[in-house]
Amino acid sequence: LETEFNIREATLKDVSAISVLGRNTYREHFADIWHDIDSFLNADFSNDAIKSCINSPLSHRYLLALRNNTLIGFAKLNINSELNGMGKPCIELQKIYLKKDSVGNNLGSGLIERVMELASELDSKYVWLDVLKNNVQAPKFYQRHQFRIVDEIPYKTDRYEIGMFVMVKRLKDS
C-alpha cells in the first residue's frame, strides 16, 4: 500500500478533477442522508463553483493531496471566516474529502498539517469546522488533531434532521 503523497494549492487546471473527486467521495460517504443528492452535488461541485473559489484566493483555497500526480483528496478552506465569539481572523475548514482507498494513510493528517501551516502564514488565530453528528469517525479524527467541540448547530438534508458539531482549534502562537 503506497502512502507517499504531496500537497499543493489548486489551480484552474484542477477544476475538473476536484469536481469528480468531490462528487464521488461525497456520494460514497453521504448518499444515504439525501433523497436528491444530485441537486446538492450539482451546486457544490459544479465547475463554475470550483472556478469561482480558485479565482478568489483571499476568500477560498483548495489544498490538493496527490499521489503520482493523481488527485486522491482535498481540503476546502474559507479564509477570514467568522465564528461566533472568536472574531477574525479565522479559517473555516469547510471540507476534507479523501478517496475511500486513501483513508487511513495519514492523508487527512497531512492535509490538516498543511491547513495549520497556511492558517499560521495568514495570521489566523483559529481554524474551525462543522461535522455531521452522525459521522462517528470524523469528530474523533479532528479531536486527535486538537480540535474541540464548542457547539452544536442544526443541519438538515431533504431527508433528515442530523445536526452538526462545531469544532475549533486555536493556533499555538495566538
Place the predicted regions along the sequence by residue:
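Acetyl-CoA-dependent GNAT
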Residues: 5, 9-15, 19-32, 37-101, ...
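Conserved phosphate-binding and hydrolysis motifs of nucleotide-dependent enzymes
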Residues: 69, 73, 106-108, 146
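C-terminal "cap" of GNAT-fold acetyltransferases
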Residues: 87-91, 125-174
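Conserved acetyl-CoA-binding loop-helix of GNAT-fold acetyltransferases
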Residues: 104-117, 140-144
